[in-house]
A protein has these predicted regions:
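Intrinsic-disorder-associated interaction segments
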Residues: 80, 162-165, 221-225
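Accessory, usually C-terminal, subdomains that scaffold auxiliary metal cofactors
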Residues: 181-188, 192-193, 197-258
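Generic structural signal of hydrophobic/aromatic residues within well-ordered alpha-helices
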Residues: 42, 169-176, 224-235
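Surface-exposed polar/charged interaction patches
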Residues: 22-25, 49, 179, 234, ...
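OB-fold ssDNA-binding interfaces and closely related basic DNA-contact patches used
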Residues: 1-152, 203-204, 210, 218, ...
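Extended serine/threonine-enriched, polar tracts that run as long, contiguous segments within proteins
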Residues: 136-216
Length: 259
């Protein structure tokens, strides 16, 4: 019994020593990395046509995929996120199966590029004369809060049928009010936690899964709040780089959705 206790104490002391060294060496090895060296995960809705369904263990339509870690989230249970920043863009794509899978061009929301497009009969895509098409794309930069309360950055892209969800979310965020010493004010976007779940949707073109958004309440952890604020500032400064992929790569979208 005494020997067992002694071994347990030795293991505990070793663990404490290792933890002390880890803390002392925090961040070492990452000195030469910047934003160009990291991949910002996309949180992507899986549909029946998503390549991961049938290829990745456990992947099912309606789930949410972290494109960097490969983590799958149950769409019914949802994920907890803190929205940190929002950028809308017009993205020019080559027709499916053509090009590199990367955007041909990314235009700011202030661009008049849509005035240079047209639509084909029975097709709601906005085509340029060169055959490429433009997608109105809403980018929601979020912190995903895991079960331990740890925040991790990610990007949710909403387009096509999900643009109305994006507008609804923006309105929800803008409607949050708090009372300060000078009266009512709108708190920063990254002050609130939201639960995102998925639900089946359809129209005469087909079926897919879409987002459902519910406000949970205010961020309670100061560490989480500061992490979200820092992420928001990085996005605002242009330091967060996004590598969109087209429908073939599926990195930027929510799977194939009817228009």
């Amino acid at each position: 019994m005494a020997k067992t206790t002694e071994i347990a104490e030795q293991k505990a002391n070793t663990a404490l020593a290792i933890m002390s060294d880890l803390e002392q060496d925090a961040g070492m090895g990452f000195e030469n990395m910047n934003q160009e060296d990291y991949a910002l995960p996309f949180l992507r809705l899986l549909t029946s046509t998503s390549p991961e369904v049938g290829e990745m263990d456990g992947a099912m339509p309606g789930m949410v995929l972290n494109t960097v870690t490969g983590e799958l989230y149950d769409g019914k249970k949802g994920i907890m996120v803190v929205p940190c920043a929002y950028i809308r863009q017009y993205i020019e794509w080559a027709p499916r199966g053509q090009g590199s899978g990367a955007p041909v061009h990314v235009y700011p929301a202030t661009s008049d590029i849509l005035s240079q497009t047209h639509r084909e009969p029975g097709d709601n895509k906005d085509y340029l004369d060169n055959g490429n098409y433009i997608e109105n794309t809403a980018n929601h930069y979020v912190m995903v809060i895991d079960a331990d309360g740890v925040p991790n950055p990610a990007l949710i892209v909403m387009k096509s049928t999900q643009l109305k969800k994006s507008r609804k979310w923006n309105s929800m965020m803008q409607s949050v009010k708090m009372t300060g010493k000078n009266g009512l004010f709108t708190p920063p976007m990254y002050s609130q936690v939201y639960r995102l779940t998925t639900a089946a949707e359809s129209n005469d073109k087909g079926k897919w899964y879409g987002w459902e958004i519910e406000r949970v309440g205010a961020v309670e952890s100061n560490d989480v709040y500061l992490s979200c604020k820092q992420f928001a500032q990085s996005v605002g400064a242009g330091d967060v780089k996004v590598k969109h992929e087209g429908a073939d790569g599926a990195g930027a979208g929510n799977g194939s959705q009817p228009f």
